[in-house]
């Protein structure tokens, strides 16, 4: 994305959000806990799948099984009961748990059946594998824990942005503003390594005024920033953690 479409935008203002999936995942309310675990699985299944492929050198099919089985444990409320947000970030905790899980599964003779109630989240493993291959990672890399933390962080950001893009598309469509999303998609998401389409060219393609291109893109960028920050807020346990993560991951400076 170009400089003016960074997640912080011109002001880097924070949205007013109140719900944390990290905290709700340990709720006594089954519906609240299920909602939280769905959100965590949606944000982290793809990073964990890629992590298992690279860190443990697992095949595509084995990584699918392990990822679904791992998140089944989260839905059974076994792992997150031990998570202390004051001591570690969620992704670090999940990485450690995933390492233990894969190591234990390697020793176990019994494998949980794939898809056996592991999660209701939609897991598009083919898309995840395609992303992994395009990134050209060294599948034989014997990476250190520190470098794997960095890898997981980058994949979490990628996953969060993907979720935000999907939500923006859905919101724009429901509000009759799909053209706003299409302009954002073409100008900000599809221009890597290619000549960027000009505002005048977009105006001609969509048969609108150049000023409308400017206004529609400003709307889409603002909404994308809001949605991405909302998604990040759900994955943190406190306002302080949210603000730290926003600065570190998204380049947002709180006012």
Task: Explain the meaning of each model-derived region.
Residues 1-255:
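Intrinsic, short, N-terminal disordered tails of RNA polymerase sigma-factor systems
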